[in-house]
Structure formats: C-alpha cells, structure tokens
C-alpha cells in the first residue's frame, strides 16, 4: 500500500520495494508495481508480470557511495581525518566530464562528503584509491552476479571487467553510474552493513511442513565476510548521521534508530 501511495504521489511509471532480515537473508516482503491479479492474469500486459526487484537493474546513484566509504577504511587509506575541497559545487573531472553537487560545499571530511552526498568530494577521495580495491569490493558485495534466488528472471546486474574500465570509471561507479544493480543486490549490500559485514544468500522460503513434519528448512550461511564488525559499526553510525543531519532527514522516525542513504537512479 505504501508503494502504491508513493507511485500515485510521484506519478511514477513503476516502483519496487524489498524488506530483508539482515541477520538471516530472509525476504520478509517484496512488491513490484505495476502488478497483476493471478486469477485473471490474461487481462494484463506482459510488463505487469515482472518482479522488478529481481529482474530490473539500474544505475543506483548515490546509494553506491558506500563503496568508496568502505574502501577507504577496509583498505587502510588513512584519509579519515583529511578534508577535501569540494569546489563549491562544480568541478571539471576531465576536459569533457563535469561533476556537479546538489548544493555547494567548500572543504569536507570523508564522513561529511557521504552525509551531504557530494559527488565532487567522492571523486577527490577515489582519486587516491587503487582501481582494483574498488572493483574487488564491488565483486565482494555480489554486484554483477545473481543472488541465487530461484527465479529464471533474476538479473545479474552489470559490472564490467576491470580491463574495460576507463580512467574515470572508478569515480562514476563510486557515485552509482556505469554499473547496474538490482534492488535485491542493493538490499543485501546494506544488510551486510547491518549484520557485521556478511553477505548473505537471500531466502524466500523459511520452511516447509507436511502433516506436521518438517521437510525443508532454509540454512543461514554467509557467502562471505566483506569487512569486520568494527567497520560495520562505524558505517552504521555514518548512515544514522545521514538520516539525522544529512540528505535523508525525511526518514527520521522519532524513537527509532534509522540509518540510510539517498540516491537518484
């Protein structure tokens, strides 16, 4: 219902949403609009049959700024206390590539760059990073790979091999461009931040019982640990600051600890 309300309010052509338990990978809710009634499916066009949460990949925008943020700490770039000049909102990355921020900033720390979602600040940060570190972190998060859900329509997203990256790719991928992800991939990435750094396999079925006899129970088994719990706690606090003081203030719920990141796909 909330998804439908959002579609009506924004007049969007489509929308999808997913809720995952970050400790188990269980998919608690999943929705895609437009949808259809299976009792009279023949009255709908093929576009309504898609579960966009798993079948559609898109450029995730600033939600992927977790990549340079985590990279800076995971690979010990020692830039946590540095400040970066954000060019007051406009910056020529190359003679043909220009970056703009949604609001002008002077100099910001890496934490404030993330909180205020500065594209220019991100470009300055990744300029000090190894291309392979950013690529490897994308791989570790599972981008470019199917999650293993039992649906033939699942998309693997799009992550080009490192040999096909240009000189500006590490900047554009770090601001969520030149890469395609599905919403389930992105949800699992943020779940890893919430659970101590573990990428989990998603589950749509928790158990199956027949005549009170259990014939199937899903097993919670991490695919890999991407980073340690200490780094996870640090990122969670920064995500909370995004909601409390940054671009996601509208997500602030009194009485609840909420963390998040805005992004324009």
Name what the model sees in each region:
Residues 15-18, 22-62, 67-265:
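Beta-lactam-recognizing serine transpeptidase/beta-lactamase-like catalytic domain environment
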Residues 1-15:
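Conserved, well-ordered alpha-helix/loop/beta-strand core segments that scaffold catalytic motifs
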